[in-house]
Design a protein with these regions (language model features):
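Intracellular juxtamembrane helix-capping segments at the cytosolic ends
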Residues: 150-165
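Helical-face signature of the major facilitator-like transporter fold
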Residues: 43, 47, 137-149, 157
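Short amphipathic helix-loop junctions that connect adjacent transmembrane helices
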Residues: 46, 55-78
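Pair of pore-lining "gating" transmembrane helices in MFS-fold secondary transporters
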Residues: 32-53, 142
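A late C-terminal transmembrane helix in Major Facilitator Superfamily
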Residues: 166-190
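Helix-to-loop junctions at the C-terminal end of transmembrane segments
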Residues: 91-110
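C-terminal ends and interior cores of transmembrane alpha-helices
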Residues: 114-132
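Juxtamembrane intracellular "pre-TM" segments in multi-pass secondary transporters
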Residues: 6-40
Length: 190
């Protein structure tokens, strides 16, 4: 057997009204959790800066140097993101799991948040100095993905351990994941 059974399914709703009542119960239970508004704010703010970076960095990498960009071609960007970035993301995720398992989430969450946001400093330095060295630019992108992998594990575990526990844990985790994505999407609407 490859997949876990997941337990037994709840009985199906008999009517639309019953389904609606269950949904309201799940949402009400979510917002009645102790400290939930702090958790929601934390989740949104954790990824807010990333939302800005996701919109701007591709433009910054492609823009000509004369207008403040780095003037990279599609192949270079693809290599940095698709190959080196993907490997760095996996490595960051694995190391974060190891780090958290040895120290605990409460003792590591602040450092995970710092590592998650460290790449934004690297992009600031790239914008100021506009290096031409591909290794330096690639290193900043690798740092971004490593930090993203490292920090994202912390946020995921935070949602699993602090937000999800309770009667409707799967629904509450899914709801927290949606809130997390809101933190990334809000900057796009600005």
């Amino acid at each position: 057997r490859m997949l876990p059974s997941g337990g037994t399914a709840a009985t199906g709703a008999a009517s639309g009204r019953e389904t609606w009542n269950r949904l309201v119960e799940v949402i009400r239970a979510f917002f009645q959790k102790k400290h939930i508004w702090y958790y929601v704010a934390f989740i949104i703010l954790y990824r807010l800066a990333e939302g800005f970076v996701m919109k701007i960095v591709p433009l910054f990498l492609k823009a000509e140097r004369s207008v403040g960009g780095l003037g990279l071609g599609e192949q270079e960007i693809g290599l940095y993101y698709g190959t080196y970035g993907a490997a760095a993301f996996v490595l960051g995720s694995l190391l974060a799991g190891y780090y958290i398992s040895h120290r605990g989430l409460s003792r590591t969450l602040f450092s995970l948040c710092c590592v998650f946001n460290l790449p934004f400093l690297a992009y600031t330095l790239l914008a100021i100095y506009q290096p031409e060295n591909g290794m330096l630019i690639g290193s900043a992108i690798v740092l971004e993905y490593f930090g993203y992998g490292f920090g994202f594990v912390g946020l995921t575990l935070f949602m699993m351990q602090q937000v999800a526990p309770g009667k409707h844990q799967m629904a509450h985790y899914a709801f927290a994941s949606g809130i997390m994505n809101l933190g990334v999407m809000l900057p796009g609407s600005i």
